[in-house]
């Protein structure tokens, strides 16, 4: 009888101790999360990356050494790209020369020469710029090139970096984004697929989303009119953007599908470092007959054409290796051939002598 009692007591004690330990770790985890708020879960690696990015910014602008950042502003550092880190220029974007000229006047000059735009209210820089048009036409590349050419820091907004599980913290992160942009000016705040973030408001919106949009508009209106901080949005669904936000994007540029001349320029840029067959390559033929292709489509077409030549090289080299003609490490006996028109027309399922637009693609 006493033996049974002892076993029961031991079992109860074991369960009690196990429960106590579990509760201890659970409460400790919850307390740490509450204390950390939106910064919870930030690893040492993330914090080290933030510190490294800040050092780059200070090295580029020594005056920032006197600037202090709060915890929320530091979380935005990982989203910042300096002009030195951007490898895209207007020379890398083909077929958009008239648009680039307009963007110089609307974006680059206000960022580089704010004194010109502060002399008169009529010359104030636009509060925002919207790039809209079909996908794959270079809107994001244009935004990066604008930051590169103007020497502005580039903050790319991602919803994952704004939204937080703690109530009210998302608003603080948005506030930190604007305050950090003011400290790092000249600065471009870029919102890709802006329609997904600033879409038309309705009574069915969640409270958190509604307050976040209201906070964003308030901070947007609070930007100084010296043009040193500018918001650029990109979308292929302009009709989904709320009218209140469209009003704050007075400069709107359509980035449409390229015409024949534009496609020629885009292809020239894409193939400038690629060997082309002098006798069997007709760039104008390809440009004239790729109607409806976006810049992204043309890039993929060029990639597929180059891949065909690479596959031929691999096949020939394997045959020579198998026959014992060359060694596997031999790189001088065989070269990748230049690209030909047929490499492109093959991908469009056409005969090289036919016009591409007159034939079915299936």
From Swiss-Prot:
The keyword Translocase applies. GO terms for biological process: extraction of mislocalized protein from mitochondrial outer membrane; protein hexamerization; protein targeting to mitochondrion. Changing residue 193 to Q: Loss of ATPase activity. Does not affect formation of a homohexamer. Residues 1-12 are mitochondrial intermembrane. It is found in: Mitochondrion outer membrane; Peroxisome membrane. Residues 29-362 are cytoplasmic. The chain crosses the membrane at residues 13-28. GO terms for molecular function: ATP binding; ATP hydrolysis activity; membrane protein dislocase activity. It catalyses: [protein]-with a C-terminal TM segment(out) + ATP + H2O = [protein]-with a C-terminal TM segment(in) + ADP + phosphate + H(+). Interaction with PEX3 inhibits the translocase activity by preventing unfolding of target proteins. InterPro entries: AAA+_ATPase, AAA_lid_3, ATPase_AAA_core, ATPase_AAA_CS, Mito_OM_Translocase_MSP1, P-loop_NTPase. Its EC number is 7.4.2.-. Changing residue 73 to A: Impaired ability to extract tail-anchored proteins from membranes. Does not affect formation of a homohexamer. Coiled coil: none annotated. GO terms for cellular component: mitochondrial outer membrane; mitochondrion; peroxisomal membrane. Present with 3530 molecules/cell in log phase SD medium. Outer mitochondrial translocase required to remove mislocalized tail-anchored transmembrane proteins on mitochondria. Specifically recognizes and binds exposed hydrophobic surfaces of mistargeted tail-anchored transmembrane proteins. Acts as a dislocase that mediates the ATP-dependent extraction of mistargeted tail-anchored transmembrane proteins from the mitochondrion outer membrane. Able to unfold protein substrates by processive threading through its central pore. This is Outer mitochondrial transmembrane helix translocase. It comes from Saccharomyces cerevisiae (strain ATCC 204508 / S288c). The gene is MSP1.
């Amino acid at each position: 009888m006493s033996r049974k009692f002892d076993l029961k007591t031991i079992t109860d004690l074991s369960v009690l101790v196990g429960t106590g330990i579990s509760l201890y770790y659970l409460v400790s985890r919850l307390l740490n999360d509450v204390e950390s708020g939106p910064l919870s879960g930030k690893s040492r690696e993330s914090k080290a990356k933030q510190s490294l990015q800040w050092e780059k910014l200070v090295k580029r602008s020594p005056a920032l050494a006197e600037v202090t950042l709060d915890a929320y502003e530091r979380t935005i550092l990982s989203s910042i790209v300096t002009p030195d880190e951007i490898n895209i220029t207007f020379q890398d974007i083909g077929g958009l020369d008239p648009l680039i000229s307009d963007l110089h006047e609307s974006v680059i000059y206000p960022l580089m020469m704010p004194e010109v735009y502060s002399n008169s209210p009529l010359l104030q820089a636009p509060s925002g710029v919207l790039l809209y048009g079909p996908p794959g036409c270079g809107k994001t590349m244009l935004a990066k090139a604008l930051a590169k050419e103007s020497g502005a820091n580039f903050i790319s907004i991602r919803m994952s970096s704004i939204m937080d599980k703690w109530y009210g913290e998302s608003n603080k992160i948005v506030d930190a984004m604007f305050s950090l942009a003011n400290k790092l000016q000249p600065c471009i705040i870029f919102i890709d697929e802006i329609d997904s973030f600033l879409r038309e408001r309705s009574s069915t919106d969640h409270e958190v989303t509604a307050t976040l949009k209201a906070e964003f508009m308030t901070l947007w209106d609070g930007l100084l009119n010296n043009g040193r901080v500018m918001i650029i949005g990109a979308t292929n669904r302009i009709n989904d953007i709320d009218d209140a936000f469209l009003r704050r994007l007075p400069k709107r540029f359509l980035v449409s599908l390229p015409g024949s001349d534009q496609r020629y320029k885009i292809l020239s840029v894409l193939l400038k470092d690629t060997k082309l067959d002098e006798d069997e390559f007709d760039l104008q033929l390809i440009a004239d007959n790729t109607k409806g292709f976006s810049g992204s489509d043309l890039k993929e077409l060029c990639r597929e054409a180059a891949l065909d030549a690479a596959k031929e090289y691999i096949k020939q080299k394997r045959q020579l290796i198998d026959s014992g003609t060359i060694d596997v490490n031999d790189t001088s006996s065989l070269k990748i051939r230049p690209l030909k028109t047929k490499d492109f027309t093959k991908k469009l399922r056409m005969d090289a002598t036919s016009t591409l637009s007159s034939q079915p693609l299936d």
